[in-house]
Amino acid sequence: MIDKLEDVERRFERLTADLSNPDVLADSARLQKVSKERAGLEKLVEAFRTYRKVLADLSEVEAWLGSSDADEKAFARESLPGLKEQRDELEASLKILLLPKDPNDEKNVILEIRAGAGGDEAALFAEEVMQMYLRYADRRGWKADILDMSPGNAGGVKDATVTLSGDAVFSSMKYESGVHRVQRVPATETQGRIHTSTITVSVMPEAEDVDVQVNPADIEMQVMRSTGSGGQSVNTTDSAVRLIHHPTGIVVKCQQEKSQLKNRTMAMRMLRAKLYDIEQERIRNERDSARRAQVGTGDRSEKIRTYNFPQDRLTDHRIGLTVHNLPGVMAGDVEDVITACRTFYQAEALKAQTAGGPKPSA
């Protein structure tokens, strides 16, 4: 591990030197690339330097155990447990930081939320979950845009598409893909019976032009007037755009902007993300076919979480996590849940790496 860490440190130092290179400073694209790579290594290098200092301190303190000076010997005995604990914690952190990075982690995301089983109650919950993610995005300092939204018959939303942009959005949001189940007594329930409804959340990394090539000849564009709640027209021009990708049958729609050109640009972002997601899923299926039968994967059809309102309980079925703070969670306080998912999958990846098996995808 030390050899690998020293290689990373040397690379970090070269990148740091490049930031003072006039040729790099004159090339904005190259400067951005160097800055981004250096930032990605900084946390690992800082941890390694701290680890190296702790090892040096530990070696020095262990030498004091053989000292003839009683005070030095007593100090060594007192200091050793803390230094060993610090060493072990840093080793664990470094192993995590050395895990292969998900190439999509730094990407923005396109988030789709769809009401599933449960009728009107599912639509109401779909809107609540959308608002939960919008509040979480606000806490993280991300930019959120609702690209498209279809209202439910009795409130809520049948489906919604949202973009989240900011620092490493996919690295956090990727754990949210799957079926979310809600158990509660609907406001219209007169007998006090608990109903179960479901929604589906899809989190796709936003693809760039270099990630996926789209043949314009494969796309049919349709324009229409934007509609609001209840289906009424909210625009007197044909600004809403629907794109149909004939090879895959994918259909995307955007009516957020008043400009048809802007809506078409947004719709193309959605289409590229869906095509990229299909390709990524194909790769994951090939790579992880044996493991997927045993461990949760973020599959769209996998029930990942239950929100039980009568018991004030959130359960994440993939990792066995239970949280009793539903009001806080629905208000956007989901960081602890996401962190628990990240920790679980990192531990699984370490196990797989040690055993030489396929790395879990999450």
UniProtKB/Swiss-Prot annotation:
UniProt cross-references to Pfam families, sorted A to Z: PCRF, RF-1
Keywords annotated in UniProt: Cytoplasm, Methylation, Protein biosynthesis
InterPro entries the record matches: PCRF, Pep_chain_release_fac_I, Pep_chain_release_fac_I_sf, Prokaryotic/Mito_RF, RF-1
Tree of life domain: Bacteria
GO molecular function term, any single one: translation release factor activity, codon specific
Keyword Protein biosynthesis in annotation: yes
Record's comment on post-translational modification: Methylated by PrmC. Methylation increases the termination efficiency of RF1.
Cystine bridges: none
Residue numbers of N5-methylglutamine PTMs: Q232
Main location: cytoplasm
GO CC, alphabetical: cytoplasm
Cell compartment(s), UniProt: Cytoplasm
The keyword Protein biosynthesis appears for this protein: yes
PANTHER family: LD18447P
NCBIfam families: prfA, PRK00591.1
Function field: Peptide chain release factor 1 directs the termination of translation in response to the peptide chain termination codons UAG and UAA.
Entry's family note: Belongs to the prokaryotic/mitochondrial release factor family.
Name of this chain's protein: Peptide chain release factor 1
Organism from which the protein derives: Myxococcus xanthus (strain DK1622)
